[in-house]
Amino acid sequence: MWVADIDIRTAKPIIDALVNRAQSGVFGYSVYTDDVYEAITGWFKRRHNWEIEKEWIQFSPGIVPALHAFTRIFVKSGEKILMNSPVYYPFFKSAERNGIEAVNSVLLNKNGRYEIDFEGFEKKAADPLVKMFYLCSPQNPGGRLWSRGELEKIGRICLENNVLV
């Protein structure tokens, strides 16, 4: 239940829900009820004013299986995935293990803070074989949350080059 190791205690309601689930003694298939979907769609509506459909939501047991699934679903043999580095190593492994070339856009380390080299990123995104960009936010291992401006710039570059994020 994590994207990266975290150094704060998990919130009590989450711990209580996990303990309650464990005490049931039943660990079969998960069933996603309407209230789960409503919680997700409601959060996106409240937080971002996005109207998302229940059918758009897919569940994954973790980021690593999701990366492999995305690679197989959205990128064909001979195409490429753009990634920043440094990054959590399974990002690159998901491309490698699925026979896809990873294009590395190196982050700039400015006084201990990672920043995106947008000039280099844009050049690499312009390669017609680059079909997807794996966005890691918060950035792991650096822990940086990309700013709204940075995310919008990534989005614009990817949209202009038909690169799925």
Roles of regions detected by a PLM:
Residues M1-G28, V163:
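N-terminal "arm"/small-domain region of PLP-dependent enzymes with the aminotransferase-like
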Residues D16-A17, K123, L129, L164:
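Low-complexity, intrinsically disordered or weakly predicted helical/coil tracts enriched
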Residues F27-L159:
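Conserved core of the PLP fold type I
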Residues C158, L164-V165:
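Donor-nucleotide binding loops and adjacent catalytic segments primarily
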